[in-house]
A protein has these predicted regions:
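Class I (Rossmann-like) S-adenosyl-L-methionine-dependent methyltransferase catalytic domain
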Residues: 1-41, 47-102, 116-131, 136-189
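A conserved beta-strand element that flanks and buttresses the S-adenosyl-L-methionine
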Residues: 108
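Short catalytic micro-motifs in class I SAM-dependent methyltransferases
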Residues: 111-115
Length: 189
């Protein structure tokens, strides 16, 4: 992960990042309402809003973010709400073995993948097949771009080898607050 990028995220978390709304996305709330609790991994969890919603619904949750400030906020929110979530400061392309040795019923990524470089995306996707449990789901939200850009935008449809274990089950196109194309994806084993 680029050092400048990491520092910029740390600076955002000294204030209040614009993406930290404190609102659980409707797609995540719908998933929680329609699936029994299991084991979840929240990649790029930020301040833990979705991780805590999953824990509140009975899920065993591990949240990962490379910004120490984000994880500090997430741990504080968990403590104040009386919820248990295993939060880690880590790079999603180099996860600790304690995380890699578990398989998850849900791997959630809200805006992490789309910020990775093409090489980092390849590394992330290579590890994904081992993280999602049989019958599990990888839910992804990101800016969606039809063309390739070097560092920003989700081109998961082009990059993910559909011959792998995970298959796209649904996609919901939308627009973010700045009218930038975005999409939710759900891949299942």
């Amino acid at each position: 992960m680029n050092l400048f990028r990491r520092l910029s995220f740390e600076l955002w978390y000294l204030r209040h990042p614009p993406w930290e709304t404190g609102i659980v996305p409707p797609e995540v709330a719908e998933f929680i309402a329609t699936h029994p609790p299991g084991c979840a991994l929240d990649l790029g969890c930020g301040s833990g809003t979705s991780s805590l919603a999953l824990a509140r619904a009975g899920w065993t949750v591990c949240g990962v973010d490379f910004a120490e400030g984000a994880i500090r906020m997430a741990r504080q929110k968990a403590r104040l709400s009386g919820l248990t979530v295993d939060f880690h400061v880590a790079d999603v392309t180099r996860l600790p073995s304690s995380i890699l040795l578990t398989s998850y019923d849900l791997v959630l990524d809200i805006g992490c993948f789309h910020g990775l470089s093409p090489l980092e995306r390849d590394t992330y996707l290579d590890g994904l097949d081992h993280l999602v449990a049989p019958g599990g789901c990888w839910m992804l939200y990101g800016f969606y771009l039809s063309g390739e850009t070097p560092l920003h935008g989700s081109t998961v449809g082009k990059q993910y080898d559909h011959g792998k274990r995970l298959k796209l089950t649904w996609r919901r196109n939308g627009m973010d607050k700045k009218d930038q194309p975005s999409a939710w994806f759900c891949y299942r084993v």
